[in-house]
Amino acid sequence: MSTRRETRAQAQQFIDNLKPLQHPNSEKVYLVGSRDDIRVGMRQIHQSETMIGGTESHPVLESNPPLKVYDCAGPYSDPNAKINVREGLDKFRANWILERNDTEQLIAASSGFTQQRLADYGLDHLRFDSLLSPRKAKQGQCVTQLHYARQGIVTPEMEYIAIRENMALSEVTDEALTQKAEGESFGAAISQPITPEFVRQEVARGRAIIPLNINHPEAEPMIIGRNFLVKVNANIGNSAVTSSIEEEVEKLVWSTRWGADTVMDLSTGRYIHETREWIIRNSPVPIGTVPIYQALEKVNGVAEDLTWEIFRDTLLEQAEQGVDYFTIHAGVLLRYVPMTAKRLTGIVSRGGSIMAKWCLSHHLENFLYEHFRDICELCAAYDVSLSLGDGMRPGSIADANDEAQFSELETLGELVKIAWEYDVQTIIEGPGHIPMNLIKENMDKQLEVCDEAPFYTLGPQTTDIAPGYDHFTSGIGAAMIAWYGCAMLCYVTPKEHLGLPNKEDVKQGLITYKIAAHAGDVAKGHPTAQIRDNALSKARFEFRWEDQYNLGLDPDTARAYHDESLPQESAKVAHFCSMCGPKFCSMKISQEVREYAAAQEVKLHTDTEFKAKSVKESGMAQMSAEFKAKGAALYHESGALVEDVELVETEG
């Protein structure tokens, strides 16, 4: 096990030597929009050819076109990009912001705390090297994407998103790949294809948000909404007892490689301000925070000493650094706190417990609720989106869907309408720990009381019996609520409830939640979702092993598992599944039946039902005879080519 010193040194080495890295057999390609500076990066996965006839020495091959998929890694997956974490990423969105002519550059930071940090020369060794002066809306101007959408303006960001969400759907012409189940969307209105105008309409309606602070021009436009691809958030951040700036930057880059659509910096330790600056300047995805965490640090962890003035200064500090969305626990009202007294696990939200303690100690209403309009005014000046925190979320399935949880949700529904008055983009946070039978009630109630504002949930976790495996227990609930209409899922790692996640934990959590999000997209009938499934299934049936790995969410692990038992080069082109060997692979048998039918010149699906049935029965009888002749063993040791076996889907 690495020591803290070794872990930090490894992270430092990682960022010092950071170079763009692409997944196997993939390349970075760009789709260009209506103007040259709208260049949408995609991951293009190349596939091998399929043998459709001939012999091994003279094969007849059919090409399988490359597949474009969503890529969250930004420049980190582009071999032509120049990466220097001390300079940050290219500010490619800066011109879009400037040409709107509704912002101005500030002479100095507005936050008193920021000014103190900049004046402290003792922090120079921690400071990001290339700081710029922040921007803010001009007097009387609103600079949010919601404001533009309501004015009927289709921004470059909206066009970028439409291209990104479509994933070059129009290029896919193979019916084997475009086939999909009808889907059950539970009232969602998914467009096919997704147009820039559709993006504008959804944002204007409040059903979707584009979290892009004007001070984070490095971020690539993305959208969070029920009628778009389900997104996944990854949490990183230091704590009072572990981690460093180097490690958090490493986790950021690592998170985007494995599909984080947004990243929340939940730092609670030393140097929160400096850590966040490094993260934002090097992030191609939107960054969220929970500002109350840093505000609490400013009063030495004493919740009772928090004030609106300290919190407001923290909002200014973070908005001018470029934070794209704030989690604000404004729905934790004084009268709701007693409702948690009979709970099995009380209040488990950190932000919720901080505000509950403040309310009780002062016997006053939550100052975040009282000053919510002030918060909205501030956010509108920087286009910071609001994520209304669920401070009363249940921390155990025993407390699910109780009075405290749903009372707060009603208040969040009131607050979202206030935020919309200020053209502030808003999403609603949700639970938590919910058994499967109560999940849909959560989604339905949120849609009703929050007027379809996007829902963003932590899981939900469906059972409480598996510490160390809560990415599984919550991934189940995440897939369900994604199907029902949740717009973004906050990942859970294997370390949930146990400790701060490391790099491998982050990857495990992300892969689990990308599966959940994708399963939700498929079930809803999203037009692009099933194409990748079909491409991988086709590769699996044709025994194109490398394509199977590369089309998957985690090519590295798939390849490693295969090579663990079948390391030989011959196994990588073997035309049988390795669980049952070459004699009893179900997919190989299916192929042989097809070949037999073709040899008999029977055209399946067009000939008579009798002939089709006859050929099928004849083929099965032949395989039955072979099975019995070889000992009638269910599993069979294969010959000299391959000695071991690999799992594939089989019936029974």
From Swiss-Prot:
Any one of the GO CC terms: cytosol
Annotated metabolic or biological route of this protein: Cofactor biosynthesis; thiamine diphosphate biosynthesis
Keywords (A to Z) from UniProt: 4Fe-4S, Iron, Iron-sulfur, Lyase, Metal-binding, S-adenosyl-L-methionine, Thiamine biosynthesis, Zinc
GO aspect biological process, one term: thiamine biosynthetic process
Catalysed reactions listed for this entry: 5-amino-1-(5-phospho-beta-D-ribosyl)imidazole + S-adenosyl-L-methionine = 4-amino-2-methyl-5-(phosphooxymethyl)pyrimidine + CO + 5'-deoxyadenosine + formate + L-methionine + 3 H(+)
Binding site for Zn(2+): 433, 497
Binding residues for [4Fe-4S] cluster: 577, 580, 585
Cofactor(s) required for function per UniProt: [4Fe-4S] cluster
Cofactor binding, per record: Binds 1 [4Fe-4S] cluster per subunit. The cluster is coordinated with 3 cysteines and an exchangeable S-adenosyl-L-methionine.
InterPro entries noted in UniProt: ThiC, ThiC-associated_dom, ThiC/Bza_core_dom, ThiC/BzaA/B
EC number(s) on file: 4.1.99.17
Residues annotated to bind substrate: 235, 264, 293, 329, 349-351, 390-393, 429, 456
Keyword Endoplasmic reticulum in annotation: no
UniProt GO MF annotations: 4 iron, 4 sulfur cluster binding; carbon-carbon lyase activity; zinc ion binding
Family per similarity comment: Belongs to the ThiC family.
Reported function: Catalyzes the synthesis of the hydroxymethylpyrimidine phosphate (HMP-P) moiety of thiamine from aminoimidazole ribotide (AIR) in a radical S-adenosyl-L-methionine (SAM)-dependent reaction.
Assembly and oligomerization: Homodimer.
Protein name: Phosphomethylpyrimidine synthase
Originating species: Shewanella sediminis (strain HAW-EB3)
Gene (UniProt): thiC
